[in-house]
Amino acid sequence: MSTELLTTAVDCFWLFFGGVLVFFMQTGFTMVEAGFTRSKNTGNIIMKNIVDFMFGSIIYWFIGYGLMYGEGNGFIGIPFGDMFMNGMAGAENMDYTALFFQTVFCATSATIVSGAMAERTNFKAYCIYSAAISLFIYPIAGHWVWGGGWLSELGFHDFAGSAIVHMLGGTLSFVGAAILGPRIGKYTKDGKVNVIPGHNILIGALGVLILWVGWFGFNPASTGGLSDGGVQVAAKVFITTNLAACAAAITTMFFTWIRYGKPDVSMTLNGVLGGLVAITAPCDLVTPFASIIIGVVGAILMCLAIPFIDTKLKVDDPVGAISVHGICGLWGTIAVGLFASDTSAGAELLGLFYGGGLKALGVQALGAVSLIAWAAIVGSILFVVLKKAGLLGVKPQEEIEGLDSTEHGLASAYPDFVVSYNEKRSM
């Protein structure tokens, strides 16, 4: 085997390995959403997360990849030359690998929205907007940054998706949850906010730990390979990713301890995710120390955003997806313009704190505003149309009964528990 073939094989394996870890994150998202919500909707949550990957894989292969990476203009790729990955028989191994790796990223962006709109969304509507995210919302945004589009030309940097995946998903989560409305009983007429606890914190914690593992594919494998200096960048990204997550978790634990008198379990778990989201854009360009600062700030922003969105804006987000992915994704995007200090990865930019002036910060801010506007405008149109058509939310009685039963004909995700409970009641 020649050196060139061996290098290609190693790079392909690296991307496939990372892609499998990112695919496994679907399990983590499913468990976080299920654990943080009520048991009567568990089966529905499982179906939604499976739908994201099923639809996402077919749709992204069909047209999404072409929209994202096809030759076109600064706004959109022209998909027809790349539809079905046209000419697959002559495609290089790395083309197939890149398709798989980007497919799992696309599915992740769609999955984020599921948590914020949990427990009251019509399954038909979910299938429609999940497909729309994979069809054009994510690919067009991705083209702007990763497909050679206009933000890429300006020097916008998002190494692994703080903006393209997480901020995009968080923005869609916000407009979707706001338009859909809250769960029954979440807010009273006199303005009181009721806590609706999840049914299994253990499942939620296991989901977070699985996501943490998956992030070691999400970020390091975004080098695109291990050759041409990729291994050095990947090694650094492992460290910055992990440090940011740990710093964010510690910060969240002490923040809630001081503010509420006890360290909050679910908030600390979300703190891990907030740190991971925040470091995803700058992880290749920042020092380990800077990654800790990014994690700390991300955690504080998340801790402030969750109660603000819940109690002030009255937007019901059962899992905190808007804050974790939207707010922390925005912070991570801006953090590039502040803390970027390593140009060895190929990005010709330095952050404000490292002598780069305001240029990089301005580009990152422009990119963030543009991507938020894209997701908010398109998402609002999509969700309003679904609501006007009577498809977006389920009927009140269906929500009360639980979506497992009304949407899927599943008596319970925990039938043994239901049988035991009913037996005790009949005694």
Specify the residue positions occupied by each region the protein language model found.
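Glycine- and aromatic-enriched membrane alpha-helices
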Residues: 1-427
